[in-house]
Amino acid sequence: GEAPSDNPPYHMDPEGMMGRASPDQIRSVWLGWLENLASFHKINYEDLELSMIDKRSNESSHLHSDLQYYKSFMEWGMDGEANAFLEEVLLWLSENLPLNPNPKKLCWGDSRIGNVLFENFQVKSLLDWEMATIGDPLCDLAWGLTTDDVSSHGLNVEKLPGSISNEEAIKFWEENTGYSAD
């Protein structure tokens, strides 16, 4: 199979899989990613005896636990130096956590189209599982859409024709999982 390139990002790689693709093929890649993500989020991890990857089993909110992890990681990485912007972001996030998060599910962790192998623009394999955890499945959707935004708008590059909009992706995911992206 073949995966959308990371370096250069697929939105900037005319020789890569996505650069050679038609808009319909690019749409097929995105829909395949979303279909697999939605199916994955329906798996009952307890039936598979995967509860051992639930690093936050004693936390009342897995999203709160994630924020605490990233705050600790930031403090470690900044080596005692303050970063007003990141502190403001963490404060906003902690004050705006969803009141009713989705049920805890198996999460891929690095759920982006660059970690999917395709054959003829159809999903063949999902890769890169070292970030897998138990948490809010919305985090997987957000990660995939955010990494796409960073590799396009974040680099002042237009998304490829056929790319799915964030709004369409969210609607598809909600309809196919029964979970909320609010």
Spans of model-derived segments:
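ATP-binding pocket architecture of kinase catalytic cores
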Residues: 1-88, 96-103, 122
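Glycine-rich "substrate-gating" loop/helix at the edge of Rossmann-like oxidoreductase active sites
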Residues: 24-26, 129-133, 160
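An acidic site on a long C-lobe helix of protein kinase domains
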Residues: 29-33, 82-85, 110, 137-140, ...
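Active-site acidic catalytic loop and adjacent metal/ATP-binding pocket
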Residues: 39-42, 79, 88-140, 145
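Generic alpha-helical secondary structure signal
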Residues: 61-65, 69, 84-88, 118, ...
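Alpha-helix C-capping/helix-to-loop hinge sites
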Residues: 73, 77, 126, 148-151, ...
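Short, surface-exposed acidic
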Residues: 82-83, 178-182
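Active-site activation/catalytic loop segments of kinase-like enzymes and analogous catalytic loops
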Residues: 139-179
